[in-house]
């Protein structure tokens, strides 16, 4: 087995990953797994750590944290271009860790590591976003779910919040605040050749099935089918949205009259309002944004 680089976000899940890492490290050592590791020290640090790992010749990089950590590792590993020689892995540890749900990995990090050490891989689709950030064009990859609207506003507010209370309390506070203040926004959305102009509560561009800590947002999504599943929550009242949320966990929201599901390989999103774009729960920029899919571009352990 080639040497593995493990990139650990010790503050993920309110510090639980940092507490679990010594046990995971001990497990890897007991199995004789050749590995190096690096601990992230600040937001976006995993991007540079993954890029440095590639520069040092590592071919297998595993993220131990949440979906945000995985997103950073993904972007660092492919900083110099999408490479078929790089194999990625993800160990659930963050508040959401939704991509590993789609992979079917155990929630326990040691059991998940034992599973991926079997060496099975699959080719999964890669999403690419082009948007604006601080007045310049920004490109970002994602592998699970991206989008805009309500969820992006919650993410933006949470990311700006002080970290002294961990991640859960600021998230719940900003979720409640956004529920009180958020209104549907006007969007222009182009799905391949189909153009929609409408007011929407949120727009989700999904490669994986889950987001938001187990919400079954795209039940029909497949990681390797070469297309996005786009879920649009059309203009609705706060009460309609609140009553819809429990259905998302069951996947039955897709039958709601104000939820529309589309398939597309290319998605354009724009608005006359300033709208944030999130990928794996991290704000990557603002609209206008273009989402493209690279079919089966990533070799992933599962």
Predicted regions and their residues:
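Alpha-helical membrane-targeting segments
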Residues: 26, 162-186, 235-259
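Short glycine/serine/threonine-rich phosphate/pyrophosphate-binding segments
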Residues: 46, 68-73, 98, 124
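ATP/nucleoside-binding phosphotransfer catalytic cores, i.e., glycine-rich phosphate-binding loops
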Residues: 191-193, 197, 217, 222-223, ...
């Amino acid at each position: 087995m080639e040497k593995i680089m493990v990139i650990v976000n010790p503050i993920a899940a309110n510090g639980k990953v940092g507490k679990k890492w010594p046990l995971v490290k001990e497990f890897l050592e007991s199995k004789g797994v050749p590995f190096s590791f690096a601990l992230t020290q600040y937001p976006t640090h995993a991007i540079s750590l993954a890029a440095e790992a590639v520069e040092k010749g590592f071919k297998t990089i595993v993220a131990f944290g949440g979906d945000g950590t995985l997103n950073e590792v993904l972007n660092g590993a492919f900083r110099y271009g999408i490479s078929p020689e790089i194999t990625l892995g993800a160990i659930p540890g963050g508040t959401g860790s939704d991509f590993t749900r789609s992979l079917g990995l155990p929630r326990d990090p040691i059991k998940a590591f034992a599973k991926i050490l079997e060496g099975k891989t699959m080719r999964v689709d890669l999403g690419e976003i082009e948007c604006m950030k601080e007045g310049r064009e920004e490109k970002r990859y994602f592998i699970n779910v991206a989008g805009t609207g309500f969820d992006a506003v919650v993410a933006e507010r949470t990311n700006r919040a002080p970290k002294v209370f961990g991640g859960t309390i600021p998230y719940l506070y900003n979720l409640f605040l956004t529920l009180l203040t958020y209104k549907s926004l006007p969007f222009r959305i182009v799905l391949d050749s189909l153009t929609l102009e409408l007011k929407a509560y949120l727009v989700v561009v999904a490669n994986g099935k889950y987001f938001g800590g187990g919400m079954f947002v795209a039940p029909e999504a497949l990681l390797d089918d070469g297309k996005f599943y786009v879920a649009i929550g059309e203009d609705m009242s706060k009460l309609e949205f609140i009553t819809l949320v429990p259905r998302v966990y069951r996947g039955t929201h897709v039958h709601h009259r104000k939820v529309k599901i589309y398939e597309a390989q290319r998605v354009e999103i724009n608005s006359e309002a300033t709208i944030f774009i999130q990928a794996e729960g991290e704000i990557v920029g603002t609209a206008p944004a273009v989402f493209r899919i690279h079919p089966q571009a990533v070799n992933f352990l599962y």
